[in-house]
């Protein structure tokens, strides 16, 4: 082991002293540690003499706090006093003094031998003269001062509330203005806010400005409670657009006197109920815009009524346009505008009642004016190139597919609002007249039955209805009469089942006569179909009988059928006016009243049928014609 070289081990002791300063050369200056007496004095100064003996938890918490304080601040620098126990002595002396004073006070209160405590008695002051008056004056001054303070406070509170309400109204006005801008076009002109009610942006050419003004609602009293329907925003609408308006379209049979024109019975249409939550200005603006649109439509119709050249001129008087689509029939278009004043409401309330107003045509007028606006916008010509191909103009325009003058003029013809609405009115009137004619025949004539099936898909100028003529209980075998009526503007096209087309005019009598003749033919056709089912043979059939009574409406139809064995024959004649006449032919052997002659000697001539005998059709039992005919055929058919 002696041969191993020694190893130097450096041992550094732990820093037991607090470093006070580190020099620039790296030297450290340490704080001298406290002596035992100084450490004891430091601990004695930390004693809290106001602490009770039972507070051990608080003492432990205080010791923990001291430990944390020592860790944060480091070693407390002790400032030695003249005597280490000086603070302890001072605390003990003050405590002893307090205890002695407390002991003396308790002895004095408990034992009366040391001191007796009596209440101090004061002599009553002599009453001063007018003491009550002074008291009242002082109370009055006090109440006046208090009232003045309360009044000043109330005034300040009212000013604060008014300012808050004004700020709230200003905020509500801005929010309502924002809602208004979302629905209507607004612009600011100076210190005014103006809106636009017209349809110029949609293509309208009506010269009315249609401007309304947005104002702030200041009619409310700030001292009173704000109503529930209060709106901080209000609109000022021109006087000629106030109230409600509509276009009354009616069809009348008799034309009034010329002195009664322009005095149409106007009834005030109630405004539509606003949706819950809709502001009142929205309802007013919509009503004003509707008034403006109605005035534009009526102005356009009046202009066209004056310009159009027709066989029967149109009449424009005041707020009414009268046209004559059919002879003895007039179409009246009136502008009904009622303001919101009380006088007009009273006068119009007496005239309200059932009117012959055609709401369909009013709706169509609004649609037509919107289509006119759309065409106005679509007719805007886009910029064209400034150059063109060289050559003569006649060579450029001519060609094999060039249009002549008539074709160009026909292509440039456009129907106006008045012409379109007159055509629609004609179609509506013709459709109503057709329905009324069919219903009257169905209610008046029970046999055969007539049924009408109206199509749900129609056009404004054309409608269709399918007419079936049947017999009750025999719908499967008696369905040969099926008519398709195409109702147009001036005429009715009838399409038969076999494809034949008949054109009828607008006259009601023509349609009625045609349906009566078809119902008459149905009875004969029903006998033909029944004969096939019963096994009878058809000898003759015609829809136009040339013999017998001449019918004023249509022609009579007839059919003759024989029994399966040929013994009996039935002849049926049916006319629209003369009615039904049924004849039966019996064999000669069953005719006893035949005169005997020498001409027919052989027995074979006895098998010929004798003369016809008319059947008393009214006394036959059965619910309809076909049922009676079935019973008759069954009775004449051999077993």
UniProtKB/Swiss-Prot annotation:
Subunit comment: Component of the Mediator complex.
Species name: Xenopus tropicalis
GO terms, molecular function: transcription coregulator activity
Family the UniProt entry places it in: Belongs to the Mediator complex subunit 17 family.
Keywords: Activator, Nucleus, Transcription, Transcription regulation
Any Gene Ontology CC annotation: mediator complex
Name the record gives this protein: Mediator of RNA polymerase II transcription subunit 17
Keyword Transcription regulation: yes
Alphabetical list of Pfam families matching this protein: Med17 (PF10156)
Location in or out of the cell: Nucleus
Function per UniProt: Component of the Mediator complex, a coactivator involved in the regulated transcription of nearly all RNA polymerase II-dependent genes. Mediator functions as a bridge to convey information from gene-specific regulatory proteins to the basal RNA polymerase II transcription machinery. Mediator is recruited to promoters by direct interactions with regulatory proteins and serves as a scaffold for the assembly of a functional preinitiation complex with RNA polymerase II and the general transcription factors.
InterPro entries named in the record: Mediator_Med17
């Amino acid at each position: 082991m002696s041969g191993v070289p020694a190893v130097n081990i450096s041992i550094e002791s732990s820093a037991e002293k607090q470093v006070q300063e580190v020099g620039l050369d790296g030297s450290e200056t340490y704080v001298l540690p406290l002596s035992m007496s100084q450490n004891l004095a430091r601990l004695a100064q930390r004693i809290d003499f106001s602490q009770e003996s039972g507070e051990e938890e608080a003492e432990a918490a205080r010791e923990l706090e001291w430990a944390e304080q020592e860790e944060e601040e480091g070693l407390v620098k002790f400032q030695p006093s003249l005597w280490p126990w000086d603070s302890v002595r001072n605390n003990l002396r003050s405590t002893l003094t307090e205890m002695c004073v407390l002991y003396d006070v308790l002895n004095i209160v408990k034992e009366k031998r040391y001191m007796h405590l009596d209440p101090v008695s004061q002599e009553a002051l002599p009453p001063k003269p007018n003491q009550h008056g002074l008291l009242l004056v002082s109370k009055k001054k006090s109440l006046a001062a208090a009232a003045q303070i309360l009044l000043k406070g109330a005034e300040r509170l009212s000013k604060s509330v008014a300012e808050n309400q004004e700020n709230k109204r200003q905020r509500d006005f801005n929010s309502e203005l924002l809602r208004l801008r979302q629905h209507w076009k607004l612009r600011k002109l100076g210190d005014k806010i103006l809106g636009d009610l017209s349809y110029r942006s949609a293509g309208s050419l009506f010269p009315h400005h249609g401007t309304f003004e947005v104002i702030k609602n200041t009619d409310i009293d700030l001292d009173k409670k704000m109503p529930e329907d209060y709106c901080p925003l209000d609109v000022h609408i021109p006087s000629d657009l106030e109230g409600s308006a509509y276009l009354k379209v009616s069809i009348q049979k008799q034309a009034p006197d010329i002195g009664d024109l322009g005095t149409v019975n106007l009834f005030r249409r109630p405004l539509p109920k606003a949706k819950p939550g809709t502001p009142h200005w929205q309802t007013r603006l919509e009503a004003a815009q509707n008034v403006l649109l109605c005035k534009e439509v009526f102005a356009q119709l009046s202009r066209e009524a004056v310009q159009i050249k027709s066989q029967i001129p149109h009449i424009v008087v005041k707020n009414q346009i009268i046209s004559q689509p059919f002879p003895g029939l007039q179409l009246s278009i009136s502008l009904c505008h009622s303001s919101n004043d009380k006088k007009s409401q009273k006068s119009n309330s007496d005239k309200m009642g059932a009117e012959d107003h055609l709401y369909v045509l009013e709706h169509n007028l609004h649609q037509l004016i919107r289509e006119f606006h759309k065409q106005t916008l679509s007719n805007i010509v886009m910029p064209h190139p400034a150059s063109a191909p060289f050559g003569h103009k006649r060579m450029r325009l001519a060609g094999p597919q060039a249009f002549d003058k008539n074709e160009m003029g026909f292509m440039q013809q456009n129907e106006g609002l008045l012409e379109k609405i007159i055509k629609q009115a004609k179609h509506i009137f013709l459709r109503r007249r057709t329905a009324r004619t069919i219903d009257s025949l169905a209610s008046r004539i029970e046999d055969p039955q007539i049924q009408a099936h109206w199509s749900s898909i129609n056009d404004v100028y054309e409608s269709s209805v399918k007419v079936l003529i049947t017999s009750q209980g025999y719908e499967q075998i008696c369905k040969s009469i099926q008519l398709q009526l195409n109702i147009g503007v001036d005429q009715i096209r009838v399409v038969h089942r076999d494809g034949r087309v008949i054109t009828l005019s607008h006259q009601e009598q023509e349609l009625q006569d045609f349906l009566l003749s078809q119902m008459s033919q149905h009875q004969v056709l029903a006998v033909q179909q029944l004969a096939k089912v019963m096994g009878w043979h058809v000898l003759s059939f015609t829809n136009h009988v040339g013999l017998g009574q001449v019918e004023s409406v249509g022609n009579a139809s007839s059919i003759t059928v024989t029994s399966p064995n040929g013994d009996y024959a039935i002849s049926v004649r049916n006319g629209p006016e003369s009615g039904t006449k049924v004849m039966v032919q019996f064999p000669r052997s069953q005719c006893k009243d035949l005169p005997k002659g020498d001409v027919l000697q052989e027995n074979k001539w006895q098998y010929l049928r004798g003369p016809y005998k008319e059947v008393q059709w009214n006394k036959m039992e059965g619910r309809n014609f076909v049922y009676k005919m079935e019973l008759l055929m069954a009775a004449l058919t051999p077993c």
